[in-house]
Amino acid sequence: MSKKVVRILRLLIELRYKYLFQFSIVIVERGSKLEVGENTKIIKSKIVVKNRHNLQIGNSCIIKKCTLSFYSDNGWRESSIGSNGNFNGVYLQAYGSFKCGDWNIFEQKSNTPMLTVFNGSLDIGHHNRFMNRFRIRYNANVRIGNYNNINERSWLRADEQITMKDYNQISYNVMIWDTNTHNIYTPSKRRELTEKYYPFFGYEYEKPSTKPVKIGSDCWIAQNAAILKGTELEDEVIVGFCTILLGTSIPFGTTVVNKVEYRFV
């Protein structure tokens, strides 16, 4: 029997046929588990659960026009979506643990993968709304509390740890990064990596410099702000438009803005 025939037979065995009536493809590999709660609708979506991963989806969720992929890696084997969740147009790749509580909204506004979890965990509370991107690598952890809102084109990127408490408002195009994202190699080393991994540019084989980012509760972060590695915001902090914070601690109730200087010519 050819490998192609074996793959087709395996797909037919792993396919959950009842979701075809909702124009969806749901594939659960042997050894993996998927539990779906009552009154949950999976519409025009694709869900894949592989590598002995266990996924639980709560009651009364709506998953529409999504591609959700769950794989086990580096010891992470469990993911869960709480009840009354709403996923609209979301592209999720989870090679780790993705867990969110009840009443969370995920709305993707671009074709770029919204949620990418490599060898790490994303743990979310309840009653949040996300329209941003996540990228988690190197077994990093992201913890987000309750009643937070993060708008379009914002980006949380973790190679170590990002924590955010409750009732925060994050505007558009905000960068929250705990990492340098890349290492600086010698020109000869970078050329070697470029040639070896072409057409994948900027390949990394080791974790760059990182330091945790902590955001308290009731903070407001304005458009185009950057909260970079080692930054800590206590409760009720306001970060102004285009403000850049790196490795600093902002005390309770403070408003921080960039220095503005005018030049008259």
Regions found by a protein language model. Name each.
Residues M1-D178, N183-I184, Y205-E236, T243-V265:
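Domain-scale signature associated with acetyltransferase and cell-envelope carbohydrate enzymes
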Residues S188-S209:
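Flexible internal linker/loop segments at domain or repeat junctions
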